[in-house]
Structures are given as C-alpha cells and as structure tokens.
Amino acid sequence: MNTTGYDILRNPFLNKGTAFSEAERQQLGLTGTLPSQIQTIEEQAEQAYKQFQAKSPLLEKRIFLMNLFNENVTLFYHLMDQHVSEFMPIVYDPVVAESIEQYNEIYTNPQNAAFLSVDRPEDVENALKNAAAGRDIKLVVVTDAEGILGMGDWGVNGVDIAVGKLMVYTAAAGIDPATVLPVSIDAGTNNKELLHNPLYLGNKHERIAGEQYLEFIDKFVTAEQNLFPESLLHWEDFGRSNAQVILDKYKESIATFNDDIQGTGMIVLAGIFGALNISKQKLVDQKFVTFGAGTAGMGIVNQIFSELKQAGLSDDEARNHFYLVDKQGLLFDDTEGLTAAQKPFTRSRKEFVNPEQLINLETIVKELHPTVLIGTSTQPGTFTETIVKSMAENTERPIIFPLSNPTKLAEATAEDLIKWTGGKALVATGIPAADVDYKGVTYKIGQGNNALIYPGLGFGLVASTAKLLTQETISAAIHALGGLVDTDEPGAAVLPPVSNLTDFSQKIAEITAQSVVNQGLNREKIVDPKQAVQDAKWSAEY
C-alpha cells in the first residue's frame, strides 16, 4: 500500500476511518488526521445506523447510505449485512426509482461508475480503464437505461440501477466490491422531461439507434473483454428492441447475462416451482397467461418454455401452453408490430370461436381458464376482482404473480389476491409485501425480486471462472431456489424471504459453480467448486 495520508481517507476501498490502529496511523501518515479514540467496526456500524435512523424520508436514507459507501465501502457492507432486509428496498428496488427520477437534483459521487458517451466512442477503453483505476474487475453491470424499472427511458440517471445491482451482489453473495464496475452507456434519451431539464447530466439529444448504436455496443464489449478478460458482463434495463439482440449476439462467446430477460424468467420460474411444490401440481399441466409481452414478459415465457422442453415436450407442445397479452389484447400471428421474441408464441385466430373479442384481460381469462397469471405490464390495478375470481373458479390453486414495480405500477396487491380467492391464490409480487392475515392463516408473500437469484448465480460464475452461462447452469440455479419452500407451513411463501438472502445465495453460487465445472466451462482448474466459492467470498471486515 503506497498511498498515505488523506489519499487513504479519500479512497473508499482503503479507508477505515476511526478504526485505523495507532500503528497504522503512524505508518500511513494519518497521525493527527483522525480523533484519538480508535473504534471497532462494530462501534462504527452502531454509530452509522443511528445516523441512518435519523434520516427521513426513505430517499434521504438512501442518500446517506450512498455517501457512506463513497467514504468507507467495508463499513457500508458491514452495516448492510446486519440490516439486509431493511436496506435492500432502499439500496435497490423500490427506492432506487426515486433516486433515478431525481438523479440530477441530488447528484452524489457516482460510486466508481464508468460513464461511456456514444458521442465519444474513441474514449470507451480509456474511460473503463480510468474507472477501474487498476482494480482487477471480475463483474461489470452495464445499463443504457432505456427501460428502467418499468419507468421507461431515464438516460444517464439510470446508472443508479447498475450501482444498486452491484451492491446487492456483494451484500447477498459476497463478491469483492473492489472487483466490480457499474457502467452507464449514455446513448442519449427520448425522455423529453430530461432533455428540457437544465440540470440533466447526460447527452442532451435523442437516443441513437440501429447500426450506430450496435457498433458502439460492440466497441464497448471489445474494450471490456480486452481490459477484463475473465469478467462476467451483466446487462441491465436495456430497451425491448435491443436487449434480446445484444444477448443473442454475445451469449455464445463470452460469460454474459441479461437480468431482465434471463433473471426475471429465472426468478418467476423458481416461484412457480415453489407454488407447484405447495399445490403438488406439475409444470406441464399449467396454462400461462402473460400480461405484458415486453422484455421481462418474454424473458419469463422463454425460461418456462425451455423448462417445458427439458420435461420432454416438443417445441410446438411447449409453445401451446402460452398466451401473450399486450396492449393490443391477445397476440395473434397477424398482430401488427410483433417483436422477434413474441412471434414464436403468438396464437392463430382459427383456434378461437370469437378471436375479435379477446382484446381485454377479463375476457381472455374468462375464455381461456389459465392456471398461471403473470403481470409485467406496469398497468396498475389491472388484475381486478372479477378477473381473479374467474381464475379461482377454474383452478384449485391459481398462481398469480403481479410483478410490475415500483409500487404504484403493480397489477394488484397481495392482500386483495388472497381475499378475492378465499386464500387459494399462490402469490408472488414484484415489490416487498407484508404478510396477509386471512381467516386464521398468515400468508407470507414471496417477492419475485431478481435479487433472490442473480447474486448467487453471478458469484458462482465468477468463482468458477466461467467462460459461458448455459441453459443447463440456469436451470440448476432455478431448481436450487425453487426447492427452498416450506411446503408443510400453512400460508408458506412461494419464494424464500430476503432475510435469508445470504444463506441461499451461497447455495445457488455453489450449485452454479458445480454446473460450470461439470460442463468443463471453467477457465482455471477447479477441484472442489464449493471450496472455490468459499475461497472467493469477501467479508466486510477490516
């Protein structure tokens, strides 16, 4: 460690603040720069938590935590380890949405993020190098913020989602925060509010698209792999026209993962397996209506489709289990404006007596009798009492997942779903939901939050030095999470609670690493995948 004095106190990866020992203060040129009392990290955490508690509202609490991160990374994670359930919705979803909306007004140091401008493609590699600052980067989370949190295009403000995502990676799975890098791709924005905001910090022009955009993405991937050849590249909140295209282009050549396409599909399928474990039913016997056929909705469909094929169904048999509903109603093969992801799962009008009437969700549910209803529409309140009761009339344990977030965009509340179905519904929500007490039973509500699965998956890939992420590995991680449900408990949640996040993230990481090694996709020799995960785990201690 050649850095001394105030340079150390300004470096969040090195700074221990008042916890520096007397010997360290002498050695590092810190004598006289700190109060004389030497604190333990536990004392610092107690002090910081009291400061956190004094903040209100939640956005102020988030700003406090971000400033703490910028000052002392180890203390930040030590504190988060102690309060993971409380901090998760503040560091990440849903409070991060407020942070993104007000990013320009509350701007703080950007947590060591790299900002790449489409207007300066020649600077891409240098920008990544500067942001890494000599650190050995193993995980990159990148966003262009075209599809932030179901909120749409938020330009450079969306960097906060990459920052929050990486904080969850470390808090949940133990990846070393010095080895991660959030990246913002500033391709412009089509958000008029931002373009007219004099404080907006991004490029003040409309988004670039097409060939110019994809060339920039390719330049970024090339530079990222050149600088960090053993890293996992995680794509976050890209728009529906680009997300699948980008994933398809790179997934066969590098270790890469799109959380909105793959992660959302993984967590929903894990929740479905949890529900089916409770109801004692089989995946192949379900009929799925997906309300919202964008990036997230189609990611869910494709993940379930892959699992149905693994269960022995042909492509056509597996596709026949799905009904896609978007703003046009039920999607048919002649519907205008279909995306490439939607086309394989559309229906023929010839299948129905009254196809022209299948334009609203109420009619569709009444006519088709789905057993599983998944919402990624960002249309609040659309899972009405009539629709939900219709489902409950035709299936013993309807699986209903209103996943849109933040809170104001949810299709229904967990409490309503439980009461409208007489306690029959198996529910997961996209936001944290309180327990529901109904007729003497306490129903615990699983949160369909990708944070339940991507930290363990990503850490397992990093720890095993994975070359690629395959469907086999994805399936292994899904089954690991879906098998954690307590089927003997009345009102059991279909997904495990965030309070147990570190425990099951460890299990998912170990199973992921084992899958990588089983397929021979590890770069470095690994004899014991479980030990490799343990050896790579970082702990928030000085």
UniProtKB/Swiss-Prot annotation:
Binding residues for substrate: K165, N450
Residues engaged in binding NAD(+): A293, G294, T295, A296, N405, N450
Keywords recorded for this protein, A-Z: Lyase, Manganese, Metal-binding, NAD
Name of the top EC class for this enzyme: lyase
Pfam families: malic, Malic_M
Positions bound to Mn(2+): E236, D237, D260
Claim: Transcription is one of the keywords in the record: no
Coiled coil: none
pH and activity: Optimum pH is 4.35.
SMART domains, A to Z: malic, Malic_M
InterPro entries given in the database record: Aminoacid_DH-like_N_sf, Malic_enzyme_CS, Malic_N_dom, Malic_N_dom_sf, Malic_NAD-bd, Malic_OxRdtase, Malolactic_enz, NAD(P)-bd_dom_sf
Regulation: Oxamate, fructose-1,6-diphosphate and L-lactate act as non-competitive inhibitors, whereas succinate, citrate and tartrate isomers produce a competitive inhibition.
GO cellular component, one term: cytosol
Gene Ontology BP term (one): malate metabolic process
UniProt-annotated catalytic positions: Y92, K165
Any GO MF annotation of the entry: manganese ion binding
Cofactors named for this entry: Mn(2+); NAD(+)
Substrates-to-products reaction catalysed: (S)-malate + H(+) = (S)-lactate + CO2
EC number(s) stated in the UniProt entry for this protein: 4.1.1.101
Assigned protein family: Belongs to the malic enzymes family.
Oligomeric and partner information: Homodimer.
Role, per record: Involved in the malolactic fermentation (MLF) of wine, which results in a natural decrease in acidity and favorable changes in wine flavors. Catalyzes the decarboxylation of L-malate to L-lactate.
Protein name listed in UniProt: Malolactic enzyme
Originating species: Leuconostoc mesenteroides
Upper lineage: Bacteria, Bacillati, Bacillota, Bacilli, Lactobacillales
Gene name of this polypeptide: mleS
